[in-house]
């Protein structure tokens, strides 16, 4: 009986030692193999970030390249594609010549189709805001009244066209007369005033619905209001309600 109990105790001790050995071995293996796997992942992210950043920097194209023709004549390049040694000592209104170079990345040629680095351009000595209106475009306003006395002006920003050369900033402020149209025709308004003016059709067409209702319910002011409107529309005194000009 005693040997049997002793044998059971020995078996329990051996089983306990075996379990401890297995557990300690698994923990060692888990610690041993998990660290090398984490290390390469840790080292991988910085290199990927650097490669992506380098690639984005290398493929970035300057904004002016969109306006620059490829393999064109240097002297005909847009102003944004060249750098010129301008000066303000020239005589206003007189022809002047400046030395220029194409900007970085712009490839151009001379009249003989040979690559050219330095070239000259001829222009009139004047600042950009002194150019004729055909050489720049401005932001138009539709919030001002064209029919007013005195005639309204508004402040806007103008930009010189690519083919025009000038001194100073190519974007400048300017004050312009209010000049826009909403699509109303003077001939249509006059025809409606003559034919259907007694029903207020001319005023409704111009967007003046209050006056149109007044003419409609008074039968054109018994003809007097109709005659007055024909005269006012014919001379341009009565215009669209939105303040625009006739077409």
Swiss-Prot record:
Task: Name its cellular compartments.
Answer: Membrane
Return the InterPro entries for the record.
TM2, TM2D1-3-like
Q: Which UniProt keywords apply?
A: Glycoprotein, Membrane, Signal, Transmembrane, Transmembrane helix
Residues carrying a glycan: 87, 99, 139, 155, 169, 179
Q: Please tell me where this protein is predominantly located.
A: membrane
Which first-to-last residue range defines the signal peptide? 1-25
Q: Which domain of life is it from?
A: Eukaryota
Task: Give me the segments passing through the membrane.
Answer: 180-200, 216-236
Q: Does the keyword Repeat apply?
A: no
Q: Does the keyword Glycoprotein apply?
A: yes
Membrane topology category:
Multi-pass membrane protein
Ranges for domain TM2 come to 183-231
Which residues face the membrane's Extracellular side?
A: 26-179, 237-247
Q: Single GO cellular component annotation?
A: membrane
Q: Which residues lie on this side of the membrane: Cytoplasmic?
A: 201-215
What the record says about family reads: Belongs to the TM2 family.
Q: What is this protein called?
A: TM2 domain-containing protein 3
Q: What species is given as this protein's source?
A: Xenopus tropicalis
Which gene is annotated as encoding this protein in its UniProt record?
Answer: tm2d3
């Amino acid at each position: 009986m005693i040997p049997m109990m002793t044998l059971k105790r020995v078996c329990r001790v051996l089983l306990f030692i075996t379990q401890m050995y297995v557990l300690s071995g698994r923990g060692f293996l888990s610690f041993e193999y998990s660290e090398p796997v984490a290390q390469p992942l840790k080292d991988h992210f910085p290199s990927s970030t650097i490669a992506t950043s380098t690639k984005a920097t290398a493929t970035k194209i300057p904004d002016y390249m969109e306006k620059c023709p490829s393999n064109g004549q240097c002297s005909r390049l847009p102003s944004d594609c060249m750098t010129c040694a301008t000066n303000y000592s020239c005589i206003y209104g007189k022809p002047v010549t400046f030395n220029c170079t194409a900007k970085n990345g712009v490839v151009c040629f001379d009249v003989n189709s040979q690559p050219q680095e330095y070239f000259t351009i001829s222009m009139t000595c004047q600042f950009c805001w002194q150019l004729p209106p055909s050489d720049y475009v401005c932001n138009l306003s539709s919030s001002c009244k064209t029919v007013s006395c005195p005639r309204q002006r508004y402040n806007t920003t103008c930009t010189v066209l690519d083919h025009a050369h000038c001194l100073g900033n190519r974007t400048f402020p300017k004050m312009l007369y209010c000049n826009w149209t909403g699509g109303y025709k003077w001939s249509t308004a006059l025809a409606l005033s003559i034919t259907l003016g007694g029903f207020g059709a001319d005023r409704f067409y111009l967007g003046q619905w209050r006056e149109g209702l007044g003419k409609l319910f008074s039968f054109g002011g018994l003809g007097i209001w109709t005659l007055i409107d024909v005269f006012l529309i014919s001379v341009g005194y009565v215009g669209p309600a939105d303040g625009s000009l006739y077409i």
